[in-house]
Swiss-Prot record:
GO MF annotation list: protein homodimerization activity
Name by which UniProt lists this protein: Apolipoprotein A-I
Domain of life of the organism encoding this protein: Eukaryota
Quaternary structure note: Homodimer. Interacts with APOA1BP and CLU. Component of a sperm activating protein complex (SPAP), consisting of APOA1, an immunoglobulin heavy chain, an immunoglobulin light chain and albumin. Interacts with NDRG1. Interacts with SCGB3A2. Interacts with NAXE and YJEFN3.
Cell membrane found in the keyword field: no
Family, per entry: Belongs to the apolipoprotein A1/A4/E family.
Disulphide linkage map: none
Gene name for this UniProt entry: APOA1
GO biological process: cholesterol metabolic process; lipid transport; positive regulation of cholesterol efflux; positive regulation of phagocytosis; positive regulation of phospholipid efflux; protein stabilization
Organism: Erythrocebus patas
Function, as annotated: Participates in the reverse transport of cholesterol from tissues to the liver for excretion by promoting cholesterol efflux from tissues and by acting as a cofactor for the lecithin cholesterol acyltransferase (LCAT). As part of the SPAP complex, activates spermatozoa motility.
Residue span of region Disordered: 1-20
Compartment list: Secreted
One Gene Ontology CC term in the entry: high-density lipoprotein particle
Tissue expression from the record: Major protein of plasma HDL, also found in chylomicrons.
Length: 20
């Protein structure tokens, strides 16, 4: 089951891009 898209997912994506 896939968890619902949450704002935190977006934040994690942004953080990942920023960190790299």
């Amino acid at each position: 089951d896939e968890p619902p898209q949450t704002p935190w997912d977006r934040v994690k994506d942004l953080v990942t891009v920023y960190v790299e």
